[in-house]
Amino acid sequence: MKSSKYPFNKIANLLLLLFISSICSAEYLDNLSIKKIIDGDTVHVFHQDETYKVRLIEIDAPERNQPYGRDSTNYLKFLLKEGKVDVEISGTDRYGRKLGRLYWKGRDINREMVTAGYAWVYDDYVTDRSFYENQSKARKLKKGLWKDSNSIPPWEWRKRKK
């Protein structure tokens, strides 16, 4: 009986170590200038003589040529019109973009894009399940892309366009 507890403790300790290392690996950069807003989930920011391409985590906004794509981009421009943000970087994607969460005056911009109905929760990559509550409210109130009951998530749109 005792031998069955040992593997569990080992696994639990390993999971705890992985969780702690993931928290510690996040990098927080403050007061960055917005250089360019590419679309509703990608921006270029400037920090210490270097420009970073940042992909907003937890969300997937409509593609530029997709219905609501321009609206999504314009809403992100509206949110970031004052041009300075804080970024919590949690990694790098396969395209070399920094994966991050944007904050403007303490406001979570990634979450705001979902709350306003200009981005979906990115099912395959979401780690903060509370984003689904924001999405449900936006859908119920028919905000942004939820005005169209046939809206297609970007990941499906991209598959269809291949």
Language model segments and positions:
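Small beta-barrel nucleic-acid-binding modules, primarily SNase/OB-fold domains
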Residues: 2-18, 22-162
